[in-house]
């Protein structure tokens, strides 16, 4: 599990991307889940979405950051087939989470906590 409070997403912009997890060499993520533990808030904020991406491929998208308790999940049968995939046999690979807001910049956030849960595995060395 990776948990991030509003500080990780603080930027004088409407979009920011952070590295939330680094796949090990021969790493696999079989399941992924985003959970809004505490709703994000800011004056004028009308929308806040989170997207989890690996190597430019969305595995979770349009997760609602304004609703406490919101859950977005994916497994091998969903997420465009990008879960259960070995990204590299020789290098680590980053899983990023992008926050995109409307109505307020991300540095105006006054509350919020997002949790990322991953079911991972690693192939043995050849």
Across the structure, where does each feature detected by a protein language model lie?
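C-terminal interaction-tip segments
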Residues: 102-126
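Solvent-exposed strand-to-loop "edge" motifs in beta-rich extracellular domains
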Residues: 34-39, 121-123
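Short, small-residue-biased leader/transition segments that mark boundaries at the very start
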Residues: 1-3
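Surface-exposed ligand/attachment interfaces on beta-rich extracellular proteins
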Residues: 7-26, 36-82, 91, 99-109
């Amino acid at each position: 599990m990776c948990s991030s409070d509003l500080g990780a997403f603080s930027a004088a912009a409407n979009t920011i991307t952070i590295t939330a997890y680094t796949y090990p060499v021969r790493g696999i993520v079989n399941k992924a889940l985003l959970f809004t533990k505490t709703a994000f808030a800011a004056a004028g904020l009308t929308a806040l979405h989170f997207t989890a991406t690996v190597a430019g491929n969305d595995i979770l998208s349009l997760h609602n950051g304004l609703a406490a308790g919101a859950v977005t999940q994916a497994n091998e049968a969903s997420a465009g087939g990008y879960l259960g995939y070995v990204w590299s046999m020789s290098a680590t690979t980053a899983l990023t989470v992008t926050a995109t807001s409307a109505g307020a910049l991300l540095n105006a956030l006054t509350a919020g906590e997002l949790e990322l849960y991953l079911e991972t595995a690693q192939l043995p060395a050849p």
